Amino acid sequence: MAKTIPMIITNNSILIKDKESGEFKTFTMPALIETPNIPFYHQFAEKIAECQYYFKEFMKTIYGKKLSKYIFAIIVPDDTSRLESIFINEFFVNSDTCKAVAQMPMALALQKDENKYVSISKSSRNIVVEYVRNHESVVTKYYDMTTADPNVIMADAAKLHIDLEYESVPIFINNYNMNMDEYLSF
């Protein structure tokens, strides 16, 4: 059975779990320019061969030379589009660092013990409020991250779906980018 490598795509880097220490190591592509509201990995397309080379070399430092036997288990931002998911899969598979890719949005990976919850996350372009029931996304609402009011978002989260109006469901702040301090007081 193939071994998996856990990874998280954040707002500006890729976190890869080190097999020895169990800690996440950060891969940041050199010379990428931060562009508002555009995920950093979009720039990989401009220099795809170079980015794949640097990524493969980085992976060799953590997992050695036989990379193609692994499956990447990647947690992606909640606002990742289907087209972006395809690009992410192709980028990793074609970099000869894995044999397959499995993706899951952050909201679905956030909580394993609760059957119903609301996730609030902030990507490089959106704030995403998502109602999750039985480990599936039921309703998702997007807000512009530059103009959204945390008070409005928290109020909307409580009435995102009819289930939420009649029973108490926990709200989790998905703070993997460490950029949601204004929500932590709720």
Predicted regions located by residue number:
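Loop/turn residues immediately N-terminal
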Residues: 12-15, 125-127
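Small-residue-rich
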Residues: 17-19
